[in-house]
């Protein structure tokens, strides 16, 4: 039997493909407009054709993939760590209004502090290895993910929670049966919002701490005037960010549609 959700999934996939194509077109158009309106030397500013020619060389791609893999690994560590910590803290705050009133303003204020100013302290404390890189990535993910997840937990209908408790359910049971199902789509939203931030955090950690991955290579390329490789790295990272963002957006829509249909 054909699943009733198949047509909607196909529509979501088609919509995601169109959005991805539109994003790529807008980026390339903006890139070309920038090159034609700003007087920058062609030696420094590379065109889409220059990047295409660079990436068309197999040796160039072979040298870039391991660096990209390291950056994505660093980003994944920070992304997963930040999301897990945000999920735990948001659950704790959702269970306790006093804790939320005590700590949430401070956590929100921390978001206003540029990570560039904190990164040297983090590097001194945790070193230039995996721990320091993961901490920086998690730090840039944590606060926006926390606020989004907490909003989802608070969105559970009060009437449903009261019904659950009226039938003898504990606070934890009400959370599992009512609060968490309503929060799941919002948690996917948190993942979509922060996934590109985690890649930026990984690049920042590689620039300031480890010197590894594409972040470290981009710093060396800027110092060594390897502008074709630098622009190609930026394009590859941008493409990865757009693709990952669209995949998570599709998952978010699919989960939201499924949760809405089952309520």
Regions of interest found by a model, annotated:
Residues 1-25, 246-263:
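Transmembrane alpha-helical segments of polytopic membrane transport and secretion proteins
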Residues 5-9, 37-83:
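Periplasmic/extracellular loop-to-transmembrane helix junction in inner-membrane transport proteins
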Residues 97, 154, 185, 231-263:
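C-terminal transmembrane helix and the adjacent membrane-cytosol boundary/short C-terminal tail
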Residues 108-144, 151-152:
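Generic hydrophobic transmembrane alpha-helix motif, especially the helices
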Residues 123-125, 200-237, 256-263:
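Glycine-rich helix-loop "coupling/hinge" segments at transmembrane-helix boundaries
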Residues 135-139, 172-205, 231-232, 244, ...:
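Transmembrane alpha-helices
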Residues 148-193, 214, 218:
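Short cytoplasmic-facing helical segments at TM-TM junctions of multi-pass membrane proteins
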């Amino acid at each position: 039997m054909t699943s009733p959700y198949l047509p909607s999934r196909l529509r979501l996939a088609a919509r995601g493909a169109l959005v991805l194509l539109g994003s790529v077109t807008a980026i390339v158009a903006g890139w070309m407009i920038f090159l034609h309106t700003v007087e920058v030397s062609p030696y420094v500013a590379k065109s889409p054709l220059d990047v295409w020619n660079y990436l068309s060389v197999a040796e160039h791609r072979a040298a870039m993939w391991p660096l990209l893999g390291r950056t994505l690994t660093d980003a994944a560590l920070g992304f997963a760590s930040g999301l897990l910590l945000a999920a735990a803290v948001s659950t704790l705050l959702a269970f306790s209004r006093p804790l939320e009133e005590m700590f949430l303003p401070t956590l929100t204020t921390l978001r206003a502090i540029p990570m560039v100013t904190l990164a040297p302290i983090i590097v001194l404390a945790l070193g230039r290895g995996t721990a320091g890189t993961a901490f920086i990535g998690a730090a840039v993910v944590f606060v926006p993910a926390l606020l989004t997840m907490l909003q989802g937990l608070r969105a559970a209908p009060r009437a449903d929670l009261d019904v659950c408790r009226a039938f003898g359910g504990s606070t934890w049971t009400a959370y599992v049966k009512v609060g968490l199902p309503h929060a799941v789509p919002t948690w996917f939203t948190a993942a979509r919002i922060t996934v590109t931030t985690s890649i930026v955090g990984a690049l920042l950690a590689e620039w300031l701490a480890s010197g590894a991955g594409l972040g470290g290579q981009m710093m060396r390329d800027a110092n060594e005037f390897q502008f074709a490789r630098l622009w190609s790295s930026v394009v590859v990272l941008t493409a990865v960010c757009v693709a990952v963002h669209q995949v998570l957006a599709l998952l978010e829509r699919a989960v939201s549609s499924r949760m809405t249909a089952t309520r």
